[in-house]
UniProtKB/Swiss-Prot annotation:
Function: Bidirectionally degrades single-stranded DNA into large acid-insoluble oligonucleotides, which are then degraded further into small acid-soluble oligonucleotides.
Gene Ontology MF, one: exodeoxyribonuclease VII activity
InterPro entries from the UniProt entry: Exonuc_VII_S, Exonuc_VII_ssu_sf
Originating species: Burkholderia multivorans (strain ATCC 17616 / 249)
Pfam families, A to Z: Exonuc_VII_S (PF02609)
Keyword check for Transport: no
Domain of life from the UniProt record: Bacteria
Complex formation: Heterooligomer composed of large and small subunits.
GO biological process terms, semicolon-separated: DNA catabolic process
Protein name: Exodeoxyribonuclease 7 small subunit
EC number(s) given by UniProt: 3.1.11.6
Length: 93
């Protein structure tokens, strides 16, 4: 028998929930999901939904880290290195 979703009963992790606004919020939600899954009290269906949500959160966190890494590369290449190559006038920074 085919399973149909009931209206208003959207399980977490099926793609319907929007991703968090920032890395810290996503990481906190991911940690909560992991704790719930490790607790062993979730049904198989809830575990699968939590896994899917967790996978989406991990992908989001990786994407955010890659963005920050790219920004650091830009800063390191264009701004930070030339500023560090001064004659020592601003050594107290």
């Amino acid at each position: 028998m085919a399973k149909t979703a009931s209206p208003g009963a959207t399980p977490p992790g099926n793609g319907a929930e929007p991703l968090p606004d920032n890395y810290e919020t996503a990481l906190a939600e991911l940690e909560t999901l992991v704790a719930r899954m490790e607790g062993g009290a979730l049904s198989l269906e809830d575990s699968l939904a939590a896994y899917r949500r967790g996978a989406a959160l991990v992908a989001f966190c990786q994407q955010q880290l890659e963005k920050v890494e790219q920004q650091v590369r830009v800063l390191d290449g264009a701004t930070l290195k030339p500023a560090a190559a001064t004659d020592g006038e601003d050594d107290d920074l």
